[in-house]
């Protein structure tokens, strides 16, 4: 068998503010991002299908989470009252892992140059 990691990227638009930053910090003001989320799946490649998971299945599994995030104010979503990249990555993990057991990492990028990766506890 061959253990492999695959990934699928998603983008969504959302607004947020960080309530616990020092007064005057730019992230304390309402602002938005074009977020990028990468879901990584690690497992054995099925010898019959030649894949770990169908990309369409992964997309369908992420859709309910995507719809909760896209064009929303993240601070209003339960669990995202302090929506840092770190908190958002773990929150996405908690939504997706129950339906995609082979999920091995969630990457969240707020900008082209900044983000984080959550790999579970």
UniProtKB/Swiss-Prot annotation:
Binds 1 zinc ion per subunit. It catalyses: 7,8-dihydroneopterin 3'-triphosphate + H2O = 6-carboxy-5,6,7,8-tetrahydropterin + triphosphate + acetaldehyde + 2 H(+). Keywords: Lyase, Metal-binding, Queuosine biosynthesis, Zinc. This is 6-carboxy-5,6,7,8-tetrahydropterin synthase. It is an enzyme of class 4 (lyase). It comes from the Bacteria. GO terms for biological process: queuosine biosynthetic process. SUPFAM superfamilies: Tetrahydrobiopterin biosynthesis enzymes-like. Catalyzes the conversion of 7,8-dihydroneopterin triphosphate (H2NTP) to 6-carboxy-5,6,7,8-tetrahydropterin (CPH4) and acetaldehyde. Can also convert 6-pyruvoyltetrahydropterin (PPH4) and sepiapterin to CPH4; these 2 compounds are probably intermediates in the reaction from H2NTP. Belongs to the PTPS family. QueD subfamily. Its cofactor is Zn(2+). The active site is at the interface between 2 subunits. The proton acceptor Cys is on one subunit, and the charge relay system is on the other subunit. The active site is at residues 27, 71, 110. The keyword Zinc applies. Pathway: Purine metabolism; 7-cyano-7-deazaguanine biosynthesis. InterPro entries: 6-PTP_synth/QueD, 6-PTP_synth/QueD_sf. Zn(2+) binds at residues 16, 31, 33. Its EC number is 4.1.2.50. GO terms for molecular function: 6-carboxytetrahydropterin synthase activity; identical protein binding; zinc ion binding. The gene is queD.
């Amino acid at each position: 068998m061959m253990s492999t990691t695959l990934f699928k990227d998603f983008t969504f638009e959302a607004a947020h503010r960080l309530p616990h930053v020092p007064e005057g910090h730019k992230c304390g003001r309402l602002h938005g991002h074009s977020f990028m989320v990468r879901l990584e799946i690690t497992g054995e490649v099925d010898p019959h299908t030649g894949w770990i998971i169908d990309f369409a299945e992964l997309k369908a599994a992420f859709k309910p989470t995507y719809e909760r995030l896209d064009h929303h104010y993240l601070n209003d979503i339960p669990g995202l009252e302090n929506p840092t990249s770190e908190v958002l990555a773990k929150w996405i993990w908690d939504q997706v892992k129950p339906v995609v057991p082979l999920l091995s990492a969630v990457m969240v990028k707020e900008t082209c140059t900044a983000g984080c990766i959550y790999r579970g506890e």
